Structure formats: structure tokens, C-alpha cells
Amino acid sequence: MSKVLEQVEAIVAPITDELQLELVDIAFEKEGPNWFLRIFIDKDGGVDIDECAAVSEKVSEKMDESDPITQNYFLEVSSPGAERPLKKEQDFENAVGKYVHVTSYEPIDGRKMWEGTLVSYDGTTLVITITDKTRKITCEIPKDKVAKARLAIQF
């Protein structure tokens, strides 16, 4: 995480804690000529527009005070959505039994992408059951080899 994102997280985390919300992720991204500071929040049952607005107002006020980002940017606060990223240990633990999409830095048993049910997670290894054509396969993926992981929608 960059120094700017660490400073932003130090501002945002107390606000989400105060509002009893989970800070899922923070991204600072350039799209075309514009910069966007995106803050993703959640709670059991999901967040509503009023909670996003409350976080946005409080974060905007605190960011103006400490000003960790010098250039102009747009602030966006939203839910992570149905395909929520899995980043923290708790995210992986909560995803056990759910359908996930995982990519790795390098091939493992000839694959770099898996989409299936996360059967277990022990802190070091993800065990995923995938369907390959008509058969079920159980795959073990070391956590340190995971490039990205997120919840997925099963069709």
C-alpha cells in the first residue's frame, strides 16, 4: 500500500469504525485526466446510500483538514458490490462456502485462474472445488501465490 493510501486509511478507518461499518478497500486511480479516491464500505446486510453519504461527508471534511492528496480528485464512497474483493484474512474466512474467482501470479498445476466454491482456508492455503467440463476437481492454492481473489456470481 502506498504512503498516500496509508494516510487516507488512517483518516477513514476511525470514521467507519465510529459508524460501525467495515472499511473493505481504498483505491486511488487515474481515469483519463481525472483522479478518483474510491472508498469501499460494507456491513452485514449491506450498506445503503445514507451510510455512503455519511462516510463521504465525514471523510471529505477530514481530508480537507489534513490534505494528504495534493492534486484534485473525485471522492466516491460505495459498497464493494456482489463481486467483493478478498484481501484480508477475515475476507477469506468469511468466503468459505461461497463461490469465488481466484488468479495466481504463476501457474499452479497448469492453471492461473480458478472459479469455484472455496471449501476451506487455513491461513496459508485456499482449497477450491471447481467444475472442469463435467467433473469436480479440488485445487489447493497457496495464499502467497494469489494475485487477486474476489467473490463471484455463479451462473
Swiss-Prot record:
Q: Which GO terms describe its cellular component?
A: cytosol
Which GO terms of type biological process are on file?
ribosomal small subunit assembly; translation
Biological role stated in the UniProt entry:
Required for maturation of 30S ribosomal subunits.
Q: Which organism is it from?
A: Listeria innocua serovar 6a (strain ATCC BAA-680 / CLIP 11262)
Listed A to Z, the keywords are: Cytoplasm, Ribosome biogenesis
Q: Which superkingdom?
A: Bacteria
What family is this? Belongs to the RimP family.
Name this polypeptide is given? Ribosome maturation factor RimP
